[in-house]
Amino acid sequence: MPLTRDFRETVMARVKADPAFRGELIVEATNAFLMDDMETGKALLRDYLNATESIADIARELQINEKSLRRMLGPKGNPTLKNFLSLLKVCSSVEHLTLQVGYH
């Protein structure tokens, strides 16, 4: 079910205003990837990058083309493990997060 424009705009506004929410997007994206839900993980990272308007900076940090980063996180994108881990490292660093895997 596609998200409405109002919902997306609300999420984007919250990302800009709430550092904890930005961090949770990264954590939830990581959890989605670990649970083999690539589409959700890519969508969450894409939302994070778009809302923070940091895609150009992150691409530069990763030393990849901005267009390649957008493609990687697009619906047909298939990021390599190396690219994905590098992206998580940079995004979590920007938000001052330390990601770690736990078990329940």
Q: Which sequence ranges carry the predicted segments?
A:
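DNA major-groove recognition helix of helix-turn-helix/homeodomain DNA-binding modules
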Residues: 81-98
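Short alpha-helical DNA-recognition segment
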Residues: 50-70
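Major-groove DNA-recognition helix of helix-turn-helix-type DNA-binding domains
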Residues: 76
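N-terminal flexible/basic segments that precede or flank functional cores
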Residues: 1-44
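Short, charged recognition helix plus adjacent turn
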Residues: 9, 71, 97-104
